[in-house]
């Protein structure tokens, strides 16, 4: 993705802290004008044009899209190219030496990941998010700014935690579940369910319910 007012802009800003990393191109499935750039970096075109790009210029890939399913699908599409997926980590993030971070992740400013926690591939741990000890966070999860999990929480693949949401100890959040902003989750949530409010009331099954694999 190449939205400077979205996840791409956040990722690009973090990469300015790393003098050994140069962003050589963006790919974006939206229609963009010929010759378009972001801060002087060319937008080549949609992801289908990736195979035609000079891959000798690419050492690693990062997919900067906030939407879980879109991000996950693009990573799967790019995987056969054999180019490594890089995790982008803000220098102010605090990560325990015993935590494990998967490939293609984004860890935002002032995020905290505590001891023995595991973060799956392609997951976003956004600004100021707290992942407490002994958590298991799946692939392509998005924890929005200020969200917080207590100890021993499990979050399955493709789940989303909204801004300022909290999860109490030992809770499991199902695959592709959606937790609205400010919600406190005190009990397990099934796959594909959207919840909201202090008591995490079930509202409806969300749009990702049909995800397989």
Q: Residue ranges of each PLM-predicted region?
A:
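Phosphate-bearing ligand-interacting subdomains
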Residues: 32-94
